[in-house]
Amino acid sequence: MSLTITPLSPALGAQISGVDISRDISAEERDAIEQALLQHQVLFLRDQPINPEQQARFAARFGDLHIHPIYPNVPDTPQVLVLDTAVTDVRDNAVWHTDVTFLPTPALGAVLSAKQLPAYGGDTLWASGIAAFEALSAPLREMLDGLTATHDFTKSFPLERFGTTPQDLARWEATRRNNPPLSHPVVRTHPVSGRKALFVNEGFTTRINELSELESDALLRLLFAHATRPEFSIRWRWQENDVAFWDNRVTQHFAVDDYRPNRRVMHRATILGDAPF
């Protein structure tokens, strides 16, 4: 096995080379990638011209795949969703968020492939919830560890943007009905590494349940700002056929919306996870 892992920043991020994910990777390669993901939280691979079927196959080596209730998907490969700025409003990605935390079992991770890019712009940033939690003072860590927060699908997918046609409205209403607001711990324990991470995000978290509305709003503002500090984050400048694979259990990300009216097309396969604790 010739797989090479190059760390990119102290908090998170590593580049992997020496593996071709268009083919069915070996068990040894799969285990090495999983260990790298646990350590570095987000992995980047250059020059991976994969098709949707290959992308889904690679992602499925790490768990069952999720079909997104709102975003369009590849017709013959529904496990791969399409983020195409020419056809879909993707402004919700231009906010710090952890994918699908409105689910009882949010995603374990996601595999994102760059298909069409603007000449410049359209970078993505990731931030480590582990680094953010560990940098807090001990009294604040202790307080947060016993709190829960509400996550709401409609915060990132409001009706006025995602219910503009009868078909979209029906899809939005069904998604809201099937995904009512729910609670997750403010501090999540990684089910494999045991490390603790902040698990609130601006995209879906609406309030801290045990606090008053005033206290909740103030604390969430603090946590949202703290969790995305530069020293806890990494910024990736995409090239076509790049692939990113991140641990959604302990990270959040932000897609920079600075390239309009140019087009950006990305494919994402999302891996189902387990209930946060």
Swiss-Prot record:
Fe cation binds at H97, D99, H253. One of its GO terms (cellular component) is cytoplasm. Pfam families: TauD. Its EC number is 1.14.11.17. Binds 1 Fe(2+) ion per subunit. 2-oxoglutarate binds at T124, H253, R264, R268. Taurine binds at H68, Y71, N93, V100, R268. Keywords: Dioxygenase, Iron, Metal-binding, Oxidoreductase. Its cofactor is Fe(2+). The keyword NADP does not apply. It catalyses: taurine + 2-oxoglutarate + O2 = aminoacetaldehyde + sulfite + succinate + CO2 + H(+). One of its GO terms (biological process) is sulfur compound catabolic process. One of its GO terms (molecular function) is taurine dioxygenase activity. Belongs to the TfdA dioxygenase family. Catalyzes the alpha-ketoglutarate-dependent hydroxylation of taurine yielding sulfite and aminoacetaldehyde after decomposition of an unstable intermediate. Homotetramer; dimer of dimers. NCBIfam families: PRK09553.1 (NF007104). This is Alpha-ketoglutarate-dependent taurine dioxygenase. It comes from Pseudomonas putida (strain ATCC 47054 / DSM 6125 / CFBP 8728 / NCIMB 11950 / KT2440). The gene is tauD.
